[in-house]
Amino acid sequence: MKKVKVFEKVQNIVVEKLGIEPEKVTPIASFTRDLGADSLDTLELIVALEETFNIEISNQATTKLVTIQHTIDYISQQLEVDVELAN
C-alpha cells in the first residue's frame, strides 16, 4: 500500500474519532498538541488503526506515534513486513 493511501485512511480515522476537519490532519500535526487528542482518544485511534490496517501496534510503539507522519511511517513499515513474510 502506498503512503498516500495510508495517509488517507489515517486521516479519515482521525477525522471520525476526533471530530475535526480533514484540513487539520497534516503530516506534521501532533495528536495531542495540534489535534487535541487525550489518552482515551489516543487509545481509540490505536484500536481503529489496528483494525483498519490489520496490524498490531505494541504499547512501546504507541509512545513513538506522536505525529501523523510518525504513524504513517510506522504503519507503512508494518505493512511492508507483512508483505515480505507472506512471500
Task: Walk through the language-model features, giving the residues of each.
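Phosphopantetheine-dependent thiolation modules in NRPS/PKS and related acyl-activating systems
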Residues: K2-A37, I46, E51-N87
